[in-house]
Regions:
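C-terminal outer-membrane/trafficking sorting elements
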Residues: 4-5, 15, 19, 712-795
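Metallocarboxypeptidase
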Residues: 28, 245-440, 470-471
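Residue-level detector of functionally pivotal "anchor" positions at catalytic/ligand-binding pockets or at interdomain
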Residues: 427-437, 531-544, 575-576, 697-722, ...
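Intrinsically disordered, low-complexity Pro/Gly/Ser/Thr-rich segments with frequent PxxP/GP/PP motifs
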Residues: 470-500
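Terminal connector regions
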Residues: 495-530
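Extracellular glycan-recognition surfaces and repeat-rich motifs
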Residues: 531-580, 628-659
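Extracellular beta-strand-rich recognition modules
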Residues: 589-604, 612, 671-680, 694
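Extracellular carbohydrate recognition
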Residues: 609-611, 680-699
Length: 795
């Protein structure tokens, strides 16, 4: 200990924490010495929000801990004075709110909530008895899939409560040594309310979907899934007692330490590197580690339980930081031996919820936690690949609003299931191709070995569900991959447009591991292959800054040389700013049958706070606009309470270029405008948002696609087709001379005519009498890479 730490320990060690008040405070650690002192202090920094770019840490602390901060002379200000009162009032206000999905985004991959999962009576969270009743109901309804709740040996807590466990398996009453095992726990810390709900939700989902989901049935038949849903029952009941509507801030268990202090932090009481940094020997502290390793009945019970089994993976649920953490926690001086393996499978586990995938100590060093002991101590049990999900955002806090319970459960369900799939022979196969198909091309896929067992290989195949679509590539044998290794491949296809009855076509992408076939159905649509509007980022036009916005082209990075478009060229974006970039042409989808937008993008935006949205505005027939609607793409995620909550947006870090794709079919029949908008708060900033090669694809329209074409690159170049509809010949007239290419395409994107205008002209004649009756597009492409599209109807 430093002299500073000793002084604080003895000065405060005799204060009672029987009726502590908790506050949310912002610490100013812009000075290096203040940050160093903070890291030495016995505070629960594992749930702090670190904003070191602006020299700030946001933390929820007790009166005792606030006293430590004051004596350390670290500057701070209080955001919320009484957190129990704040959480309790917020939960009471939210009791009658029903959460609904983001209607702007495709939800086909979202789970259907289990019918037996219900919100509890404690602000939406379970009471202790409600949890026990639910475990009994699970066994009563699904006795062939889940065991009756059982005590962990004879261990009881300070207040006489046992710890319960259940097993989900197709043989739930038998411990089958041939099956790999995974452990799920919740609530080492009593106040982290969402953790219990997440695991109870997952259990109900597995039980209810076993009969109808082939992949889930394969998982349950071949893996034993163990749940200890409440590690800290005494602390949970204490919070229930002091705040029956939810919001209690007690973290530790309820041991009477004998010196007028109560409670041990169970996640500092494990034996691996016990007693080190991030824990305290002071019973007042929220990170009090106890008198000895495993001094507590709760940690003893978990130790004994893991020693009776051969768990390969463990997920110990906590809240809140939107992270999935792995060892080491006690030091950041080096990585664990399985660091690369953790990173590989955690990247898949967090694909849906977008949680940060890092080593625990990179957030904050903490000795004596569950993950380090499960992974590091192999003297009495095998090594366990243990992880800690920290679920929810900083604004969710320890007691998220009632309306956030289901979203948190939903976003962690794939994480729970994928953690179990890793125990099997598993190959991750991802479709990398566009949702819009040309008449012929390829479905590109990536394939990565993520299953822990050694594999003899996989057979990967793609089958068409439409007789008009032929897959020309045979099934592939994938073998010899090292763990986490990823390869790219493709399946070629052709489409017989004459026999195609529906523009939407389906494929089945399958992976056979020798004992089970995983199947994923891909839905694509045959659409126009040439864009109605193409902007290569060489100039800002036809985009236009709104107000004082400063979007511009940049040579910093691009997909197509020499520039792309970004919100803050050659610099980070500013704090407390809104930067809006409007696409000035109005897009007319009045008679379109299909619409799609693609652009290349990359970004560096403060996660959970700042964001960029790509939005559309319906322009009504009266000329009065409706509200701007955020658009959902392949790479958007739902906003937090500190952003546009629940709406699709871009945040976090995407360092490499990705091809974003936005389905616009919900706007068919409308005229719309489009814009990009960046919004920032007053703290951390980043490099911002870049996009390039922006293209709008329109299918099936017989009306003009782009209005206000005079705005394109500042050129007043508008074209007219006479006559239209036509039978034999057409005359194409432009208001100003035009030089470039003229293409005529059918609605499937096939080029049926091509004509070069080698000299500037305002009029050209075409014979179209040989074309079949129907809808066509006339594309005018100039040297500036601007495409104007006009409809043509042949009678």
């Amino acid at each position: 200990m430093t002299r500073f730490t000793y002084i604080l320990f003895f000065a405060l060690s005799f204060q009672c924490v029987c009726a502590q008040r908790y506050s949310r405070v912002h610490l100013d650690v812009s000075k290096t010495e203040d940050l160093s002192r903070l890291k030495e202090m016995p505070l629960a920094l594992d749930h702090a929000h670190w904003k070191l770019e602006v020299g700030e840490v946001v933390i929820e602390v007790s009166d005792f801990e606030l006293g430590l901060i004051q004596q350390a002379d670290i500057p701070y200000h209080v955001e919320i004075d009484d957190l129990e009162d704040f959480y309790s009032k917020r939960l009471r206000q939210q009791q009658d709110i029903v959460w609904t999905k983001n209607v702007n985004c495709d939800s086909t991959s979202a789970p259907l909530d289990p019918t037996n999962f219900e919100l509890g009576s404690m602000g939406g969270y379970y009471t202790y008895q409600e949890m026990l009743d639910d475990l009994d109901s699970m066994h009563s309804l699904f006795p062939n899939l889940i065991s009756a709740k059982e005590l962990i040996h004879t261990f009881t807590t300070e207040e006489g409560r046992p710890l319960y466990w259940v097993r989900i398996s197709n043989t739930p009453d038998t411990d089958d040594p041939s099956k790999p095992e995974i452990l799920y726990t919740s609530n080492h810390h009593a106040r982290e309310a969402a953790a219990l709900s997440i695991n109870m939700y997952s259990m109900w989902y597995i039980l209810e979907n076993y009969a109808t989901d082939e992949d889930l049935r394969y998982l349950v038949d071949n893996v034993e899934m163990y749940f200890v849903p409440l590690v800290n029952p005494d602390g949970w009941v204490y919070n229930q007692t002091i705040q029956p509507n939810g919001g209690g801030m007690w973290r530790k268990n309820r041991r009477d330490n004998g010196n007028n202090t109560f409670g041990v932090d169970l996640n500092r009481n494990y034996g691996y590197e016990w007693g080190g940094v991030g824990s305290s020997g002071n019973g007042n502290s929220d990170v009090y580690r106890g008198t000895t390793p495993f001094s507590e009945a709760e940690s003893q019970a978990l130790k004994w339980f893991t020693e009776q089994h051969a768990f390969q993976i463990a997920l110990n649920y906590h809240t809140a930081a939107n992270m999935l953490l792995h060892p080491w926690g006690y030091t950041d001086n080096f990585e664990c031996n399985d660091h690369d393996r953790f990173i590989a499978f955690k990247s898949w586990m967090t694909e849906v919820n977008g949680y940060l995938n890092i080593q625990s100590s990179l957030l904050y060093e903490a000795a004596g936690d569950s993950d380090d002991w499960m992974y590091g101590d192999t003297s009495t049990k095998p090594k366990i690949l243990a992880m800690t999900p920290e679920c929810g955002t900083n604004s969710d806090g320890f007691w998220p609003p009632t309306s956030r319970i289901l979203p948190l459960c939903r976003e962690n369900l794939p994480q729970n299931l994928r953690g179990a799939y890793i125990l099997l022979d598993y190959l991750r196969v991802e479709d990398l191709s566009s949702d819009a198909l040309s008449v012929q091309g390829a479905i590109d896929v990536s394939m990565q070995r993520l299953g822990l067992p050694e594999s003899s290989g996989f057979i990967v195949d793609l089958e068409s569900l439409d007789p008009a679509v032929t897959v020309n590539t045979s099934a592939k044998l994938v073998s010899g991959l090292s763990y986490g290794e990823s390869i790219l491949d493709s399946f070629n296809y052709t489409i017989d447009t004459q026999s195609l009855s529906n523009p939407e076509v389906g494929f089945v992408l399958s992976v056979n591991n020798g004992t089970h076939i995983f199947r994923d159905t891909l839905y694509k649509r045959v659409s126009v292959v040439n864009p109605a509007l193409s902007i290569d980022g060489t100039t800002l036009s036809p985009f236009e800054n709104q107000g004082s916005s400063s979007w511009s082209t940049t040579t910093e990075d691009f997909v197509s040389a020499p520039t792309s478009i970004t919100d803050s060229p050659n610099d980070d974006y500013e704090n407390q700013t809104t930067q809006t970039l409007l696409l000035t042409p109005i897009i007319n989808l009045s008679n379109a049958q299909d619409a799609l937008i693609r652009f290349a993008a990359k970004w560096d935006i403060e996660a959970d706070y700042d964001y960029v949205q790509f939005e559309a505005l319906r322009v009504s027939s009266t000329g009065l606009p409706n509200d701007w609607l955020p658009l959902c793409g392949k790479y958007t995620n739902a906003g937090t309470a500190d952003q546009d909550e629940g709406m699709p947006l871009y945040d976090g870090v995407q360092n490499t270029w990705v091809e974003e794709e936005v389905d616009m079919t919900e706007f068919l029949g409308d005229s719309i405008q489009l814009r990009f908008q960046l919004v920032s708060d007053n703290f951390v900033t980043g490099d911002g948002f870049y996009f390039d090669d922006f293209k709008i694809y329109i299918g099936g329209s017989i009306d003009s696609v782009i209005n206000n074409v005079s705005d394109l690159n500042g050129l007043d170049k508008f074209a007219t087709i006479i006559p239209n509809p036509a039978q034999h010949a057409i005359r194409l007239e432009t208001t100003q001379p035009w030089m470039g290419q003229v293409q005529i395409l059918n609605t499937l994107g096939q080029e049926v005519m091509n004509y070069s205008l080698d000299s500037e002209s305002q009029q050209v004649h075409f014979d179209v009498g040989h074309l079949p009756s129907g809808s066509y597009y006339v594309h005018l492409l100039n040297a500036d890479q601007i495409t104007i599209v006009l409809p043509l109807w042949i009678q």
